């Protein structure tokens, strides 16, 4: 009996202590992509994580934004976290957003956003997805609802997330 218990504990420890060689991103979330599809623009050991909230940038890639401040390029999981950074009174330059069709970063000030679709948002109850082409934004809106807006209108909508935070 003693040998069986020791053997069982040893097997349990060996199985429980083995580590996977790679992280699996088998997410059914609309915002997610595979690590091979994601473009991470930050440098350093924490480049996979939102600079504001720490969320995984691959998992929330389709709502990812980036911007420059004092020669440092930051990447955010969402426009919510970009706005959170702006709330500190800093000036962010060259804002970019991921086009959910091409998965490439585009100029956020020229993007067509679909706000309030049936797809889940990131860091907000109101979803915000960006497109480089207005026709793509309209197709998405027709399938999933929402309204089309530009970057500045989306920033104003996002500011409401922080209304009760002070």
What are these regions (language model features)?
Residues 58:
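Short functional micro-motifs and their immediate structural scaffolds
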Residues 18-20:
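Bacterial signal peptide processing site
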């Amino acid at each position: 009996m003693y040998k069986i218990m020791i053997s069982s504990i040893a097997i349990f420890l060996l199985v429980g202590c083995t580590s996977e060689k790679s992280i699996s991103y088998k997410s059914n979330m609309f915002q997610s992509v595979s690590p091979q599809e994601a473009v991470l623009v930050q440098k350093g050991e924490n480049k996979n994580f939102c600079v504001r909230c720490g969320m995984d940038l691959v998992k929330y890639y389709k709502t990812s934004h980036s911007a420059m401040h004092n020669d440092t390029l930051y990447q955010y999981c969402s426009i919510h976290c970009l706005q959170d950074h702006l709330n500190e009174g800093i000036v962010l330059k060259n804002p970019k957003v991921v086009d959910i069709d091409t998965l490439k970063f585009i100029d956020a000030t020229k993007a067509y956003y679909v706000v309030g679709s049936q797809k889940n948002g990131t860091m907000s109850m109101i979803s915000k997805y960006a497109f480089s082409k207005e026709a793509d934004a309209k197709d998405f809106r027709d399938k999933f609802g929402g309204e089309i807006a530009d970057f500045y209108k989306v920033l104003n909508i996002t500011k409401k997330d922080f209304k009760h935070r002070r």
